[in-house]
Amino acid sequence: MPEVQRMTLTQFLIEERRRYPDASGGFNGLILNVAMACKEIARAVAFGALGGLHGKASTQAGEEGAVNVQGEIQQKLDVLSNTTFLRVNEWGGYLAGMASEEMEAPYQIPENYPRGKYLLVFDPLDGSSNIDVNVSVGSIFSVLRAPEGADTVTEQDFLQPGSAQVAAGYALYGPTTMLVLTVGNGVNGFTLDPNLGEFFLTHPHLRVPPDTQEFAINASNSRFWEAPVQRYIGECMAGKSGPRGKDFNMRWIASMVAEAHRILMRGGVFMYPRDTKDPAKPGRLRLLYEANPIAFLMEQAGGRASTGRQTLMSVAPGALHQRIGVIFGSRNEVERIEGYHTNQTDPDLPSPLFNERSLFRASA
C-alpha cells in the first residue's frame, strides 16, 4: 500500500497562521509547547506501574495523601503532570501567566523568562482517579488573551467567559494518544506517532451529529437531580415505549476527556448537571479549565454546551475554581434539555418515571 502523506501539527498551525498575515507566530509556539507537555505526560502514563508513578502523592511531610485546592486526593501523576505543564510552557515567552486545577492561585512567569500576551489554564490530568485501573485519562487546556501592561497576573485576569477563548483542546491518553484542538476554525484531531514523536492530522473537521441515542450521566446521583434532568433521563430510559419512541444507550466512564472524545467521534450527550448532593458544590466540574474548553470544542464541532439554563460559554466566571453544572453534546438533545429547564411548571416535581429511591419506576 502507498504511504499516506499526513499533515503534522506544525504544518497545520503554519497553514492556519497563513490565514492571518499579521500574526506573529507566537501563538503557534504556545500550542506546540502545550503539545510537548502532553507528549511527556503521555509517556509517563504509558509506563504505568513500571514508572513508579501509580498511587497517591505525598504531603510535604512525606505522608501519603496530599490534597489539592479542590479538597481532592492528589495522585502522583497529577503532580507530575502539573509540573510538566508549568516547566514546558513557562520559558517560551508566549505566556503572561498560568492557572491550574492543582494550584490555588495563578502561576507567575519567572522573571528570568520573557512574558507573552496569552494566559494558559489547564487541568493537567483529568480522570486521574482512573489511573490505577488503566482507564483513559487526559489533559484539558484553554488559551485566553492576557491584559496588556501588567507586570503580574491576578485571578481577575483569568475570569473571562468561554466566548473569549483563543484556543482550546485536550490530549487523550488511551490506546493511542490524541490531541484534539480548536483555534476557532473547527475541530481537528491529531494522533501521536510514538516512533517519530510527532502529532499527525488523522481526524480533520470533526462534527458532532445533531441527534443521538446515547447519553452519559452518573445515575447514582439521580435522587439529587433537578426535575428537568430527571424528566429527560426518565424519557430516555423508557425507550421505544416512552414519549421519545426510541431506545437509548447509557455510558459512564468517569473521565470527562474520554466522554467528550466519544461524543466528538460519534455523537451523544454528556451530563454532569447541577444537583443538591452537596449544597456547597451545586456543580461538579470546573468552569475555566474543564467546562469552557470542552464547550468551545463542542460548539466548534456543531454541538452545543449548556448549564441547562444558559450556554456555558456565556457564563461570567466569578472565581478561578468555580464549579458549574455541565451538559454538552449533540445539539438537538442539549436543546431539548434546555427546553425542559425553561418550560418546567413545577421545578420540584420529578418525572413519574422516577420513584423516591430508584432511577426508574419499579414494575407494577
UniProtKB/Swiss-Prot annotation:
Cofactor (UniProt): Mg(2+)
Assigned GO CC terms: cytosol
CDD domains for the chain: FBPase
Class of the enzyme per the UniProt entry, highest EC level: hydrolase
Cited InterPro entries: FBPase_C_dom (IPR044015), FBPase_class-1 (IPR000146), FBPase_N (IPR033391), FBPtase (IPR028343), Fructose_bisphosphatase_AS (IPR020548)
Known catalytic reactions: beta-D-fructose 1,6-bisphosphate + H2O = beta-D-fructose 6-phosphate + phosphate
Keyword Hydrolase: yes
Molecular function terms, GO-annotated: fructose 1,6-bisphosphate 1-phosphatase activity; magnesium ion binding
Cell location: Cytoplasm
Residue positions binding substrate: D126, G127, S128, S129, N218
Subunit and partners: Homotetramer.
Entry similarity comment: Belongs to the FBPase class 1 family.
NCBIfam families: PRK09293.1-3 (NF006779), PRK09293.1-4 (NF006780)
The name this protein goes by in its record: Fructose-1,6-bisphosphatase class 1 3
Species the sequence originates in: Cupriavidus necator (strain ATCC 17699 / DSM 428 / KCTC 22496 / NCIMB 10442 / H16 / Stanier 337)
Gene that specifies this protein: fbp3
